Swiss-Prot record:
NCBIfam families given in the database record: IPP_isom_2
Cellular-component GO terms for this entry: cytoplasm
CDD domains for this protein: IDI-2_FMN (cd02811)
Protein's UniProt name: Isopentenyl-diphosphate delta-isomerase
GO molecular function ontology, one term from the record: oxidoreductase activity
Subunit organization: Homooctamer. Dimer of tetramers.
UniProt organism field: Streptococcus pneumoniae serotype 2 (strain D39 / NCTC 7466)
Length: 336
């Protein structure tokens, strides 16, 4: 069942097309008089207890099937060569099946910056086992209540999640990242997570892979919930009051370096890409994908140079305009 479900997730994630992307409603104000040389632009950032050379990473996607193994190996090769973080999909499948080697990428990619992922429905003992077996630099702990509710075989008991989060925050020996799965983390959840000791969250908003769409596609029901949740930029706007207390990572519908820059302008420490990279490794050779990802680094630098920003922190000083739904929602928040 798990193997089939994981492969269905890949299939439906690739076929899904979103009609709305919140990044298109943000316009950055260009600077006509440059201050820096291109070679002065610094892409480094810090989150989860360490410094990273680049402000983007390959986010959690898959594992638990032969197809997942193939994809994870490709993604690991891209990430290792490009010097970026790669986070595997949920390790739960391997916890259920010790012979599952679809997550075993470190042996063939020893210099890989590896993260892994587990659901908050799992008690901390399984989180500790995951860290012991995978030896990641960080552990994503995902919250996916709507996905679980839409899955016929999904979780129905959620009272333990908050106590689990407190346990993860206290007992996991590597930094943890509380991660949404495409529904947009709300500010109240960030506040509760902060109270439990969490200092890094991935907002993961609507606009990219929709697990509501995927589960409804699997079941043939409830397509009226396909657009559930807050868009990525809306979730980031909602989280502005927390950006000085909690490290905000952003994912969900990120397509290119300009989308990444827009996240960084609003205080993100780094940006995760899932479906965009999945489409690349399913379309091109690994060598070609590496070339594309290396090109993203160059593009980030040239966009930052045109905005008069030498560092990631400088981007928060960039002026911008909001349009459409984002502007309407932002105006409402200012009145509240």
């Amino acid at each position: 069942m798990t193997t089939n479900r994981k492969d269905e997730h890949i299939l439906y994630a690739l076929e899904q097309k979103s009609s709305y992307n919140s990044f298109d409603e943000v316009e950055l104000i260009h600077s006509s008089l440059p201050l820096y040389n291109l070679d002065e632009i610094d892409l480094s950032t810090e989150f989860a207890g360490r410094k990273w050379d680049f402000p983007f990473y390959i986010n959690a996607m898959t594992g638990g099937s032969n197809k997942g193994r193939e994809i994870n190996q490709k993604l690991a090769q891209v990430a290792e060569t490009c010097g970026i973080l790669f986070v595997t999909g949920s390790y739960s499948a391997a916890l259920k099946n010790p012979t599952d080697d679809s997550f075993s990428v470190k042996s063939s990619h020893p210099n890989l910056l590896l993260g892994t992922n587990i659901g908050l429905d799992k008690p901390v003992e399984l989180g500790l086992q995951t860290v012991e077996e995978m030896n990641p630099v960080l552990l994503q702990v995902h919250v996916n209540v709507m996905q679980e509710l839409l899955m016929p075989e999904g979780e129905r008991k959620f009272r333990s999640w908050q106590s689990h989060l407190a346990d993860y925050s206290k007992q996991i020996p590597v930094p943890i990242v509380l991660k949404e799965v495409g529904f947009g983390m709300d500010a109240k959840t960030i506040e509760r997570a902060y109270e439990f000791g969490v200092r890094t969250v991935d907002l993961s908003g609507r606009g990219g892979t929709s697990f509501a769409y995927i589960e409804n596609r699997r079941s043939g029901q409830r397509d009226y919930l396909n657009q559930w949740g807050q868009s990525t930029m809306q979730a980031l706007l909602n989280a502005q009051e927390w950006k000085d207390k909690v490290e905000l990572l952003v994912s969900g519908g990120v397509r290119n370096p300009l989308d990444m820059i827009k996240c960084l302008v609003f205080g993100a420490k780094a940006v995760g890409l899932s479906r965009t990279v999945l489409e690349l490794v399913e379309t091109y050779t690994v060598e070609e994908v590496i070339g594309i990802v290396q090109g993203w680094k160059a593009d980030l630098r040239l966009i930052m140079c045109s905005l008069n920003c030498a560092t990631i922190a400088d981007l928060q000083k960039v002026d911008y305009l909001l349009y459409g739904k984002l502007k309407e929602a932002n105006d409402q928040m200012k009145k509240a």
